[in-house]
Amino acid sequence: VPGNAVQLAAGTKVEQYLTLGKGEQVVALVPLTDGPPLALGTAQGIVKRVAASELGTKPEIEIIALRDGDRVVGAAPASDAAELVFIADDAQLLRFDASSVRPQGRSAGGMAGIRLSDGAHVIAFAVVGGSAFDAVVVTVAGSTAALAGTDAGSAKVSAFTEFPAKGRATGGVRAQRLLRGEDALTLAWVGSDPRAVGTDGSVRTLPEPGAKRDASGQPLDAVVVAIGTAIR
């Protein structure tokens, strides 16, 4: 997608630039430059880095060989100095050095990123740069039995530094203590200056940052469906 094609004030429908197949969705918007490798994380806990030279200039390319039932949950450029972060729906978070993931070719299937518990899957994958000292982790917990869009659940915002780094392909640490009636994380995000929105695109208020790593969340006033950051 040409960088000057999107009107930030009104937005532009993705369908104007690409055709999404059944069940497909956009998970990331990344620049194609000669910069650091592109890091990918999947729902089954696979991680991969693809060298920028492998991406080429074709309008559509396959950049990872997915296992049956797997899907990409996040992607972002990641230099060797960056850290990669997985968050699973069972409230486990793992962060490790990007340098432990050697860049592979487009057709490769990646390598183990996080060791998941039985039945768990990754809901968020992020890249944190070496200088992102203000990064935070936002987690939202709720009930998987509730109808979509009806359970606001609880949320917390913790400093990224609250979470100890571990090695690739290991288990994570607890990212939020679930309250009664909650059985999973429904949403998670890592970055700086988080902004949350509801189903209609309206702004939602998140708790103040500063929560302990494994603390429980604070009840939300309304459902949060997406978290991002301001475009600067």
Across the structure, where does each feature detected by a protein language model lie?
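Short, structured "edge-of-domain" segments at secondary-structure transitions
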Residues: 1-232
